[in-house]
């Protein structure tokens, strides 16, 4: 499994990161930061799906190899951030804040930050400044995708064969409809949950 360098995709990444930076820099009257996160999700989904489908069609797909490469790519930066954040948090946070930080650290380590912050109401209530690992929610969504989607594609390619596209399309349509319904009744769920983000 390998990626061919795509300058066009790097350009999309640059475009996507700009609204995220502007939003977190608290630029006045700027409200479009969340769009950048969606673009990153689309890029990741496109790249991973392309590579997985190529490997499956060539008969050289390996779950262990896929997971190993994801781990080698993501874990060094992830745990560097977690270690540095924990050192700083232990120095500047109050005990009550450290308790909440410990819970978010645990969820970040096990890749369920999105659900941790979803039940904590995330961006929609407490100030983000008191949640230094809040940004880990998007990585958790990606990791859940990396864990589950290869298994689905492998099984679908064996049992559905030429209908993988139809089966995947049905799942994505269900995800889209789900996100549309809950955005009005449970906005935090629509924002953080993986089923609502899958499409």
Model-derived segments and spans:
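Membrane-interface helix/loop caps of multi-pass membrane proteins
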Residues: 1-199
